[in-house]
Structures are given as C-alpha cells and as structure tokens.
Amino acid sequence: MEDGGLGMDAELGADSARRKMEAAGEALEIVPLEMYDSARAKIAANLRWLFAKAFGIDHIPEDLRDPFYRDQYEQEHIKPPVIRLLLSCELYCRVCALILKGDQVASLQSHQSVIQALSRKGIYVMEDDDTPVTDSDLTCQPIKMSSHIPMIDALMMAYTVEMISIEKVVSCVKRFSTFSASKELPFDLEDAMIFWINKVNLKMREITEKEHKSKQHLLESPSHQKSPSKWYWKLVPVRYRRDHASGRQLPYFQMLEDLIRDVCDGAALLTVVHYYCPELMKLDDICLKEVTSIADSLYNIQLLKEFANEYLNKSFYLTLEDLLYAPPVLKHNVMVFIAELFWWFEIVKPEFVQPRDVQEFKDARAVSQPKSARPTVPISNATKRSFLVSPGAADPVLPVQNSPEVCNSNKGSSGFSPSHPLLPLRQRQKKAQPAEESTACRNRSNSLTQEGHPRGSVAWSDKRQRPLSQLNRYVLHSATDSDADLASGDSVSLTCSISEDSLASTVTPKHQSHPGQGSVRRINGHSLLGNVNMDEEEELVAIARADPSKNDITLTNSEDTERQGVTPGAKSIWGRQEDASSDSRTASFFLEPLMPAVLRPAKEKSISLNKEEESGEGRQRGSTRRVAGAESAASSTRRRPPQTLNRTFTPNTSSEFETTIEPKSSEFVPPAPGQMQAFRPLVTSSVEPSSAERSPGFYLHSSVTEEKRPVQAWDAHPGTSDIETVETIEEQDAELTKELHPDKKQHFEEEVESAKLREDMNVKEHEDKDGGSRCSSPGQQSQVSSVASGSIRMTSFAERKMQRFGSNQDIRSSTSSSQRTTPDGSESCPLPLTSWRMKRDQSPTPQNKDNANMLASELVQLHMQLEEKRRAIESQKKKMEILTARQRLKLGKAAFLHIVKKGKSDTLPQPTKSEFYLKEGQKLNEEKEVSSKDDTCVDALRDRSKEAEEPEKASCEWAGGGTVSSSPLDVEEEVDLNECNRSIELLNEAIGSIQQQMMQLSLQQEMLMKQNIQSPTSATSPLANDQINTSEPRVRASIHFVEPSGSPVVRKPPKLSSARPRSKPSELLLGKEHSKGQKSSTPTPTDSPSARSIQGGRTPKAESQDFVQSSVRSESFNKDKGNHKGTTFHLNDEANMRMVSREPSSVALGVTFEESMSLRDTETTFDDGTARDNLISSEDISRGKANLIEVDLSDLAANTDDESTNALDVTADGSDGEKKSGMGFFFKDEQKAEDELAKKRAAFLLKQQRKAEEARLRKQQLEAESEQKRDETRRKAEEERIRKEEEKARRELIKQEYLRKKQLELCEEQEQPQPKPKTKPKKQRLKSVVKEEPSIDPLPKCPAANENLISAQSGSSLSLASVATTEPDSVNSGGAGSQRGESVESFPGLSRNSSRTTERDWDNGSTASSITSTSMAEYTGPKLFKEPSAKSNKPIIHNAISHCCLAGKVNEPQKNSILEELERCESNHLMILFRDSGCQFRALYSYFPDTEEIHKLTGTGPKSITKKMIDKLYKYSSDRKQFTVIPAKTVSVSVDALTIHNHLWQAKRPAGPKKSAK
C-alpha cells in the first residue's frame, strides 16, 4: 500500500534498481558538460522530433536516424538527405498536417503555407532577434539552420498547444487538488505545466504523509487499542526505532519554479508518472532526494526514458544529456515532452493509467470505517463473502487502518485455501467446530494453514487467546540451523525483545516453503519489509493492519524474504497488490480484512489473564528457538532493550545474556556481563496462533491429547480449558525432568523455566480466568539461554530429547548456563506427574510439519497486545506504587516483628502470604504482584504451603548448602533472643572501634588500595564474577540475595542513588569478596540448582549502588554436600534497623530479604539444610564466627563500588540523603571485619577527598570565567562608547557634506556662477592636507574597513580602495567638515548619492567617486538628483520621457500626453514599459512597492505586469540620458523601466520588427 514509503526506502529502491541497471550492462556513459554542444543537441533533438512525427517513430528511414555525419577532417555535418528534406518543406507539411484539420491540410504546399497556417493559430516563426522567418530563409542554400530551428520549434509549440492547454490543466488539477483561482491560475503554457507538475507532486507529498501518519498511528497512537506504541518501542533497540519511525524522513517531492531548470533531475516528472501509473512506476524506484547527484539524476532520466519508450510510444526524443544539462535552447523540446505526458495521462488514459487519487478515494472510504463499529451479532456467510475483493476488481491501495478490502489474491497458494472465509470464530465458540468453520475462522491461520490439515485440530479454543509468541515447544523441532539463512544473522524479529520465545518465528524451514511461495509477495511491487534497511539490519518488520477482533497483523520476517530470493533493497513496505499473478506469493504477507470482533471485555479492564495461557507454552521455547541456531540467539541478544526500560518487563536472574555473541551483532553490542541484565520481556499478548499446523506433535482437541491428560492436572475449574491442561502437563514433565537431572545447569529452555512461574500461574489461573494480559513472565528464560551456544545444532526432536534426558554434558555451553534462581522445580509440582515428554515419545505424529509460517502474523500480534498491556500498566502505575509502598512498610514491620517475637514459622504465616498475593492480584487486576516475583520467593511460598506433604521435595528449594533437614522447624528453639541482643552489642562495639580507627585510615589508604588490587576475588568486579560464575559450576561460599524478577513498578529496590533509580532489571547481589579465601566443593546434583541461582545474575552499575553487596567469609563447614561457606544476610527494612532474633528465620542460610520495595521485602525463606546447622552451631557462636554486626549499607556501598569495575561514585549519589534507605545485618567474620571496614572507610575517605578537590577546582574555574565575563563586558562598553563618538563625528561630516552639495545644487539650478567654491575648497584642501595625519591617527584603523563595508552594503559599487588610496588632495576635496575622503561616500546617510552613482557606473565601470567629482572646484556637470527610495521618481521619469524616450519633434504630441498623464498620477513610483532591449517606449506604469503591483497608466501594453512576465529591468541615468540594464531579477523602487517577455507581444504583421501590443 505504501507507495509513498519512507525516503530511505525510496533511495534504497533506487539504489538497488540502479545496481540492477548497471549489472545488466546498462551502465550509462554520458558526454561531459564541457564537451556537450547545446547547439548540436538542439539540432539533433529538433530533427529527431520532426522525423518521429513525420514518419512515425518506428518508421524513420535508417539513414535519417542519425542526421549527422563526420567528414574526413572529423567535422560534423548534417547529412545531405536531411538537408534536402528540410529544404523541400515535405517534413514541415507532414507534421503541420497532423495539427491542422480538414481543408487546411490541402493548402500545405510550401514553407510559406506552413508559416501562415501556424500564424493563424497564433504561433509565429521568429528567429532569435525577433525577425520573422520567411520562405526564402527556409529554402536558401546553403541551408540556414538558424531559420529551420525556429520553424521546427513553432511546429513543436503548435503540437504542444494541441495536447495541453491551460483549461485542460486546470480542470484536471481540480479533480485531485485545490488551488486559489486568483493567485495560482497559470498565465501561459509553461506556467500551466509547472502548475500541473507541482500539484501532482504536492498530492504525492500529501499521500505519503498521510500514509506515514497512519502507519505511525498504528504504532504509536495510545488511542489505537492494538497499537504497539510506547511500551513496544521501549523494548526495541534504539537502532530499530531510528530506522523505523520518525527518524526516517519522507520522500522529497520537489516544487518546480523554472520548468527547464527544475525538471532536469527527472524526479518531478517521475513522480507524475508514478502518480498516474503507480503499478508501472514504483515510488521506491525513483530517487527522490532534496539534492540529487548527477548519478541520481541520470538514473531518474534513464528510468523516465525507459518508461516513455515502453508505454508512451517512445515519445522521449531527447538524450540523457539533453535533460540532464537542460540548456535553455531545448525548452520547446522539454515542453513538448511534458505535453505528451499530459496528453497520455489525462486525454488518452490507457488502461495502465490509474491515478492515485482514485485509489485514495477508495482508501478513504475503507479507512473511514470506525474501528469501534463492531457488530453485536454474528456475521453471516454471505456477509463474509461480501468482504472479499473480487479477483477482477481494481486493486485498491490497502489502507493502513482496518479495511474490508482483503488481499484475497492467494488462490494459487498451497498454503491458503480460497474456500476459507477470512472471518473469526463466532462469539464464544469454545470447542472445535465442524470442518467448514473451525479453522476457517482465523485470519492469520487462513493465510498460513495448509488445506490438508484436519479442521478439527485447532490448537486451542476460541475462548482462550494464548500469547502468539508462546508457541508449542515442538513447533519447529526438526528445523536445522541451515534453515535460518545465515546471511541474515540479524534477522531475528524485534519481537525477540518482547517475547523471549519468538525466535521460532523467524525461521521458516526450507521444506516448508511451498511452491507458490517462492518469493516474497510484493504487493504493488514492494514487499512488506521495505521500511527497514534490510541490507544492513535484517529486522523483522512488524507493521500491518490490525484486525480489531484478533489483532491479526500481517508481517513477514527478513529471513524468509532473504531465503526466498527477494533483494532486500528492493523491498518497500505496504505495497498494493500487484495483480492475480501475485496470488501465489507468501501467504504470511496477506493483509487481514476488517473483521467483526467477538465481544469480550477489553484487556485493559481485566489484566489478570490466566498465566497458564500467557506463559504455559512460553517455556517450550527451547526447542522452538533452538532451531534458529546460535545466530538467531545472538541477534535476539542484540535486540535486548536498554536497561532503563526494565519497568515494563521482568528482570530475570538467570544468566541469559551469556550466550556467545556472534560478530555479526554490530547494531547492538550487549553490555559487559557485569552490567548485563537478563531481560524478561513481557509476554502480555493473548493471540491465537494459527490452528492446524500449530504443533503437529499434538493437538489439544485430538483424542490422543485428551486421553493422555493426567488426572492431576490443575484443570479443575470448568473455565480452565484444554490449554491449561497441556500447559500443566508440559510443566509437569519439565519438572519431572528436572527432578531426574537437577544438576543440569545448561538445560534447554523448558528446564530452565522457573518452577515459580508455574506455581504462580496455577495459583492465579482460576481467579483471573477470563483474562487480560499479565505484566510479566519472569520464569521464562530469554531466547539467549535457550540457544545454549553456537556449537549446539539441534536437528531433530529426537536429538533434543536425547540430549535432555541423557546427561550429555557436552551439550551444555559454559557461556549459556541457563541458571535459574529456583534450583529445582520439584516443589512447584508436588503431585504425582506423568512425563508429557515421555508420552510424546510414544506419539506417532510426525514432527516435521509446516509450523513456522504461522508465526509471521503472530509476532506483530504480540506487538499490538503488548501495547495494551503497557497502557494498562501505566494507567495503574501510581496506584500500585502507593499500594506497594504501604504494603512494603506493613510487611516489613510484620516480618521483622515476627522474627523478633520468635515466630514458629520461618516465613510469613502462610495464610498471610497466600491471601495477600491473591488479594493483591485481584486488587490490581493484573498479575504483576505474583507473576513478577522472583523464582526464589514464589517457590518459597509454594514450598511453605506444601511443606507438610512434600518435605522431601522442599530440600531442593533452597539447596544452597546441600542436604536439607527433614523438618523445617527443628532448630527454632536453639536460638535465643539474648544471643540476638548480644550480637547487637557486638555490632555497636564494632562500630565504635571503626570510629576509633578512622584516624589511622588515611595512612593505610595506599596499602589497602594495593591490597584490593592484589586480591583477585575481593576486588572482582561484577564482570569478573559473572565470568567466573558462568564458567565455573562450583558453589559460591556466600548466599546472594536475589532481586525478584518483579516488575519494578511494583518492586522498587531501595534507592541508594537517586541518579539512576530505575536501572535494575535484573538485580542479583554478587558478593565482591565472597570467594576470597574460599574453597568450594564440586557441586553435587543437589547443589547445582543452587549454584545456578547464585551464578545466574547480573549486576549492572546501578545494582552495585542499590543492592549493597557484602559477602563475608565465615568459617567453612563442609557437611555432606558442599555447603556454602559464608552467608550474606541483608535485611533491608526501610523503617529502621531492628533487633533480629537468632532463630532459624533470621539466620538460615538462604534468607531472602529481597532488596526491593515490593510485597516480599521482608519475607524470608530458608534452606532447611546444613547451612542452618552451620549457623546455629554452638561452636560457631562461641567462636564468634557468625556474630551479627550492624553496618550501614550505604557505608558498604562506597567500597562495593570502589571494588567494582563500574566505578560509580556512590558517595556522590548516595550521600544525598538516601544513605538511610537500608540497614543490613551481616554475619561477619569478626576477626576480618575490622580490616574490611577499614578498607571501606579508606575508600570512602579517598572519594571524599577527591570530591573536595574537584569542587575546589570547579570553584576556581567558575571564578575565572566570571572574571573573564566582567572584562568582556567592560571592553564591550568601552568599544560602544568609542563607536558612538565616531558615529557622532561621522554624522557631522555627513551633514556638512550634504549642506555643501545642496548649495551646489541650488547654484546649478539657478545657473549662477560659483566663485566661492573655487577658492574655498582650495583653502580647505590645504587645511585638510595639514590635518591629514593627526585626523587619522587618533582613530582606530578599523573604521576604514567598516566604512567600506557599509558602503558596499548600501549598494555602492564605487571602488572604495581607489577612493581610500587616492592622493590626499583628491580624497579630501570634500566640504568643510571632510577630513577623510572615504568617510563621505561610505556613510549610510550618503547612500543616496553613492548608490545612484553606483548604478550609473554599472555600464562604464567608472570607479571615480561622484562625490569627489562634484566636490571639486571645477565641477559644472549636470544637476544632482534624489534617491527615489523614500520619495517619488517622477522627476526622473519626466526627464527620461522628455530627453530620452520621446525626444524630438516627431514624438512631441505623444510626449505631451504622457507627461500630462504623469502629472495627474498620484503614484510615487513610475515605470516605463519598453518593447524590447531596443528601448522603444510603449507605456507608462505605476508601481506600488507595498503590494509589488504594476498597473498601466497610459500607453500600449498589458493592464498589469506580474513578476513572471518581466524580462529585463532598467535604470535611467539622468546625466548620460540613457537607460542601463540592471543585473537584477526583482522589481524595486530603483527600477525606472522594464521589458516583458517577447512572446507576450502579439504582432499585427509578422513583417514589422516592432509589434503593437494587445
């Protein structure tokens, strides 16, 4: 549809077309400008046109095709046969006969008869000097080409007049544009052509802008319900946003001012051609630039020539150079070509002429249908059929908005059945319908579904709209890496930024490309990807019409297009349908029709969509995405959104970004692992992917699936449909696998999926059954982790299964450890489970079906749905923030008091937790509160609720240390509140000792900083930690506190820095020193998940501020299975530091006081295993190894940042009053605590010192700048004062000079002798000679230059240099006050004299100053005259008429009448109209400078003269009594006379050199 695609697209298309032309051997060779002979070109062009019209373009005799020949001296001559034809007038008669009608043709016997026939039509054959061409001129020998060329020009003009007229142009323009009849009506044919071309170009500009805006409306308008607006773009890399939207400018449509000069690049004419023939001339094939190069112009001209040769009967009679250089002599040739264009497009109108304005009208009707006008009743089949465009109908431009005009040109495609009506299911159809309706209901499915599939195999019912991105994990199980076109390594859809599982959508296996889909369907010759620079960034463009009911959006992906052989550069977005031949193009490009929606609540109003639906199949992405290979994974990594957008999706703590990035990822290099955040884009769409080919592995409605459903599936409620069943089964079998192999850290995506997410979904699935979207799906791993590494090439489902179940460790890539914060999913699914994968092993269904094409439209669906979610999230943002802040305080206090009061549970009471979460979900109408929690918290919650019946499985929940005690509460009584108090006292003592040591720290700073550098583990930056974590499977010695993957809207971590409060998408504490001096045992299978949870995180820069990390080394207790050696216990209680009892709930190893301001701020979850035993070990306590020490977190933050490579100045940011945001309890090694605190204090003092130094330097710099400004102000004031004094003196000089000249003028008028000036100037000269030096010296030297400049600006062309350098006696011949000669003429006040003399000097080039000459004693010249700028020029005109124009006795009667009229006229400014450059007087005009109108007073000429009519301007020189041409284009009050263009005069008799006016 969008023939007006973006400017970049036009250039791309033009470039690619140019490349194709050159590749085809059509590289153009042109004559350089310096070798171009315009006279020869004029002869050749005229003869070419003449022969074409006389003989017919295809029947020109061979010897006449080239009218020139070269003689033996290499001189070019016209061939004798051509000369004979011209002399015989045969050609002229033939061509003239084409124009004349009836009897007149018979009279054409000679040159004279042709001349007379033309003159009868008002066209006179005139030579350049306005002498008429006669018969003898045309027949004389040797041939006189200077007469034959005007003859052919006159014929061309007559031909032009026949084809185009002002009336025709106006009537045609009226059809598609508006104009002001009083101002814009053309006054001649040339103006009419400019008018027509400009209006067409304006119309095209309007069309492209409208299309661009409507596209933007789809993408950005918040009122558009399904548009992926702000939130969608926030997930998109900046690179894509720049390419995609407002950064790209529209094509430049040029407005002509001069016909010949402005059409020479071909762009304007090609735009006209495109407007009338959009099917034949694509807009993106035209090079539309504001400044076109010669190559671009040549390309355009060549395109124009080819079009004219192919479709317009070879009517382009010029060469490429002729139009490129466009010499003025070829004006008639260009005009006749434009006239032919007009004639073809507006008069003849062949069938290929289909102007865009007609289609725009159709579009307007389609677009005008409101999106909200949804029928409330089902639509009949007849109505469905009526929506379809008949194949024979004219293909309309498909609107961006919803339109009933469906691209129903897919009859030949095997992927689409023409019998499937393109309408959605009826309302509330929950089960598979009979064959004719079940599958046919999906617009998207129809364009993707193979007819061979059973109709009943819809993958889910209409009731449940599942996220389009969350396809079955087996959809592309058998695709190999080779299916992903490696040339398009960046071809992953931008949806990867939105849905972590969308990689599958970017691969269409080769075996799935149907014969009818061999190439991308170019709608109107442009693929749907044209708005993306596919050559550089193989982005998946996701723009199409939204269907209001299903958000069905058509899109393609670049990999498909690449594979299918379409040159990316040639693609443009939104083409129109080409014709029936495009029927067989790729089905995923079919734009969807406007469809009635099934009535269901808006998603914004019910935002708690069942998470089973939202995410259940998202976990299957491992296989789906894996087929795309590491390359796709890398590109999906590249597409990660920036960190600051974290609030719209869930951070994930698993190290998803650690995939090896392909070198191809040039556009977006992921941050260093230390700053990397594993983004979890929200999967908030709920779109129904296509049905039949969805997942050949199983069908929800098939009997096999039904039979294999486990009884225990969480599908109890009637509203829970088959989808939930399958999702539950998949969860269960994934978790079973995890139980079997808990140590696989690099499992594929399914295993990595957080068990917490499944728990969450099942808890919430019944309460938000009807679902809106949810905010996030944190458990789902990103695409990156799903593609373990580039080395893994999954080629079949069987291999995947083998690799999953077999413990082949070689599968796992060390860089892609899909580590989960939840070590094991066993607790999430406590019921007896049957492995769905095992069942699938027995399933006979083939796995190599055509499943990928469906993803095309679904991906854009996701964008649209994400926009819905974004709006819902934003609309409740404030409410949620208030609520979460309140809840944070409440829960923080409750949890803290619960701990202090020695509660019997290790977390919040179970009813409190579950009720709170359920209530919160309901209260917010969305699932942020639950779904966005980190795995650890949710699993902990589920663990508590199921501990009684699943004590064994609970062991895996916090397998941080290894073995788990069978009873979670068996050690509660051992910790006494007194011990806690004693710990507090120890903490206070430690703080006191720290204060005492502060004086020593300045001496120790150097040493300590060196130690920091030398200790590799303590100074390890988050980058290093991440690298270690991802490459080493060993268990870290300290438990890190995991930031839940919650939406930060709900869960804001305490801010230690106000500078970057929101850059925390994935917040996992990494202890900077936690591995120092530690040994960690090799993890056992039970350790491994915990290791995953520790290693998986990223610590971005902001995290190192917001989540203060201090991992303290404690004595290691190696119990059964590799315990953690140290513990980090952060209690981030916003209210206050409080006493914490030393009961298990406060000292258990896995305590998770999450560092966020969210629901579970103080919820603590513990590992029941040996870590607890370690901590409560009396030996430990007695040795003081695990003593509780209170340290202000903000103190530690400084050191943390010092030690990290991020090097953020926490003290600069955090000391602004936010230090108090958190206090923490740490179990520290007492012996080493002082050293560590000393290091921290040293770093803190060092920073403070550095800051003070910087502040001092800044202050000095500011003072220096202010002093400099004061000096500058003083200097300027002094300069101003001096300038004013000089100006005053200058004005005095001007006044004196003026008075002297006035006196001279009066004397001259009275014709009195001037005795005084003779003697006076001599005296003055003597005085001034004496005073010359002193008068110039005190003044600065710059005034002379300034005065020269002023003089030049005032219009004077006097040579100031000559004036300034003349001898003192001549320079200073001025009046009494003149001390410097140049000062007189250079003052603005004297510009009257100087400018007048300047204009006088244009002709003779005199540089003598008139001021100097008039001021000389001997001066007796003509009288001075006044500048007419502010006064009347009547005296000048009077003088001119009397002494120049109408001088002499013969003209006296006319002169007297003219002068009388002149006296009567009240106008101040008058102008004389001359016939031509001979200055024959024709009329007198009055000029009104305000309106710039010129109206006739008396004489012969047009009533008024417009700007376009003026040819030359003249100035009258009173002293020389003659007119001089002014080298100017604009009329002003200094103009005294003018001429108009020759063609505006109509001669009464051709013979007379002077014609009477109209």
Swiss-Prot record:
What InterPro entries does UniProt report for this protein, alphabetically?
CAMSAP, CAMSAP-like_CH_dom, CAMSAP_CC1, CH_dom, CH_dom_sf, CKK_dom_sf, CKK_domain, PRC_barrel-like_sf
Keywords from UniProt, A to Z, are: Coiled coil, Cytoplasm, Cytoskeleton, Microtubule
Could you tell me where the Basic and acidic residues compositional bias lies?
602-620, 737-772, 943-955
Domain CKK, by residue range, is 1421-1555
Q: Identify one Gene Ontology CC term for this UniProt entry.
A: microtubule
Q: Name one GO biological process term.
A: regulation of microtubule polymerization
Query: Which family, according to UniProt?
Result: Belongs to the CAMSAP1 family.
Q: What is the name listed in the Swiss-Prot or TrEMBL entry for this protein?
A: Calmodulin-regulated spectrin-associated protein 1-B
- Give the organism, scientific name: Danio rerio (Zebrafish)
